[in-house]
Amino acid sequence: IEYGIQHEANHFELLKIKYKKHITINPNQSAEKKCAETIKALKDGYDLIYKAYFVDNNFRGEVDFLLKTKIKSKLGDYSYEVYDTKITKNLRPKHVLQITGYSYLLSKIQGFTPIKMYLIDGANITHDFKVSEFLDYFLYTKDNFEKFLPTVEKIDLYPEKCTFCNICPWLDECERIWVG
C-alpha cells in the first residue's frame, strides 16, 4: 500500500509541473464535502484535480487524477478524463472496470462521457482505453448489482477478509464483527 501511495504522489508531483492550475481535494473530510469540492473544482476549470471524489446512489469513487481536455461539455469549452495509478505492472480487468466506473460518475457531472481513460502502471507506462469499449459492460454490471442489493438480507451478511482490508474505510467495523 505504501508503494502505491508513493507511486501516486510521484505522479502528482510530475503532473503539477505541466499543469499549473491544480487542486487537491482533501481526502480527510466527509464524502459530501469531498464531492462538493470536486464539483466546484470541475466548474472552476482546474487543469488537474487530484483525489477527485464522486458519489451517485450506491456508487462512489475517489479518482487519482482528473485532467482537463479541450473537448466541450456542460462545464464549458472543456471536459475531463480519468487517470489512475496502479503499482502493479500487470494491469487487470478490474482496474479497467474501476476507471470505467469513475468515467461514468464523471459523465453525470460534465454531461459528457469521456472518450478515453488512463491507467499508469508500476513501470510508469500510461495505458489508454476507450471508455465506449467498456461502458456497456460496466452499466450491465452496475444494473445487476443494483437489482441484487434489495434482495440481500442484511442480517445474513458477514464481512470476508480480502486484500483491500488495509485500505477499506469499513475495517474497524469488520474487525468488531470478526472479534465479537
Predicted regions and their residues:
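Conserved ATP-binding subdomain of kinase catalytic cores across diverse folds
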Residues: 97-101
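Metal-dependent nuclease catalytic cores that hydrolyze phosphodiester bonds in DNA/RNA
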Residues: 1-75
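Short, charged/polar micro-motifs that form catalytic or ligand-binding hotspots
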Residues: 55-56, 87-96
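Hydrophobic, Leu/Ile/Phe/Ala-enriched alpha-helical segments that form helix-helix packing faces
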Residues: 15, 19, 103-106, 110
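Conserved catalytic cores of phosphodiester-cleaving nucleases, focusing on short active-site segments
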Residues: 61-71, 76-89, 102-104
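Beta-sheet entry/capping signal
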Residues: 47, 64, 79-81, 114-118
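Metal-dependent nuclease catalytic regions and adjoining charged, substrate-binding loops involved
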Residues: 90-94, 105-178
